[in-house]
Amino acid sequence: MPQQIELRNITLQAAQPLVHGVSLTLQRGRVLALVGGSGSGKSLTCAATLGILPAGVRQTAGEILADGKPVSPYALRGIKIATIMQNPRSAFNPLHTMHTHARETCLALGKPADDATLTAAIEAVGLENAARVLKLYPFEMSGGMLQRMMIAMAVLCESPFIIADEPTTDLDVVAQARILDLLESIMQKQAPGMLLVTHDMGVVARLADDVAVMSQGKIVEQGDVETLFNAPKHTVTRSLVSAHLALYGMELAS
């Protein structure tokens, strides 16, 4: 399995340019946070990595490399990169139980799909009574439960990399804390490389090792998390850090 995945000069376009020459490097055991405002190109960059661009959007330049060798995004999805989606409710088939979702995921990847394996993954993400959870349909579960089920799927994939696209969006404070605890636990136990897409600098401060800031489809600043928080350079980065510090009655040093 690869130790590094590199996005090199990814350029996306629809009727107009959307993402301009984005380059990022994911490394096993490290969390790279991709931050920026709504519409900055974060989710599109993830979609390009997985080969799931929306209709009408095409990649006009760039490549993806695994350990320095060019690779198709279709060869990465699931096997080498697991995904935790922004809206878990839309990620599950409403006609299938959680047991069917989990089992089909394992079978598609050639992983063990016995009930003991599925139960262990569900228990690992803190969902109680795994036997009952496996019988539930998506509409019978809360947003927080579905998000934890998405993380259980990522655990089952055993992929060396994870893309987590706004994993705490639209969750209450308690559910958000549980999701962050789970992501932290996965990093400690499995040491994948993680691309964490978020607009929440509190999440960045807690989980990230490195940060890339996007604005208007471009990477405007990159660095390790400590440097970026202590000495942000770009105006967008300074605005994000300042807003985060203001929550604690603090100001960014001039």
Swiss-Prot record:
Function statement: Part of the ABC transporter complex NikABCDE involved in nickel import. Responsible for energy coupling to the transport system.
EC number per UniProt: 7.2.2.11
Lineage, top ranks: Bacteria, Pseudomonadati, Pseudomonadota, Gammaproteobacteria, Enterobacterales
A Gene Ontology cellular-component term: plasma membrane
Enzyme class (EC, first level): translocase
Membrane topology: Peripheral membrane protein
PANTHER family listed in its UniProt record: DIPEPTIDE TRANSPORT ATP-BINDING PROTEIN DPPD, OLIGOPEPTIDE TRANSPORT ATP-BINDING PROTEIN APPD
Annotated compartments: Cell inner membrane
Key words of the record: ATP-binding, Cell inner membrane, Cell membrane, Ion transport, Membrane, Nickel, Nickel transport, Nucleotide-binding, Translocase, Transport
Source organism, top-level taxon: Bacteria
Native source species: Shigella flexneri
Protein's UniProt name: Nickel import ATP-binding protein NikD
PROSITE patterns, per the entry: ABC_TRANSPORTER_1, ABC_TRANSPORTER_2, NIKD
